[in-house]
Amino acid sequence: LTRGELGTRGTPEIRDQESASAAEVMGVKIRENLGFKDGFFQNDEEHQLEVIKIIRKYKPKIVLCNAKDDRHIDHPKGADLVSDACFLSGLEKIKTKLDGKTQQSWRPLNVYHYIQWKNSSPDFLVDISGFENIKMNAIKCYSSQFYDPKSKESETLISKKNFLDTIFNRSLDLGRLIGVDHAEGFTSNKIVGVESINDLI
């Protein structure tokens, strides 16, 4: 949504490079940034329409977005903005154009939210055992934000020495709850269903 220009550490240009590196680690084929104003974007018509254009462009069945309740004010704002845009994107009477072409309405089937700073109770857990190192390597691409004893920039809560350990340990603990090595938790605005009880672990 933003380029993180208000971040205490690093610059938007550094963040662009870090994002590209993280995308490569994860095998992401396409990454776009809407360039909203960091800290000041709103969940309003102007911003919703820009998100709707992206939803209609890619037609995702599942959308993952920020935590609904979090320390950083942009995270819940982003969560509400994307969630609302996902609903509105399905309304035929909302007209949008991209590259001069009229877009068709599209509503994702599900919107799920990450667990970020706060230890929110997950609505479901995904077994990520075997992928935990890829996750951590992708996160470490954003090195300007994390612990660096040589850095001259101000310390933040996520630049403390043990921060990355807390991320790894959370996936260990969530994995423990479902009997696997590592798990990732998500929250949902609606009840999550499965096609078969055999899908549950």
What are these regions (language model features)?
Residues 45-201:
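Metal-dependent de-N-acetylase/amidase catalytic core
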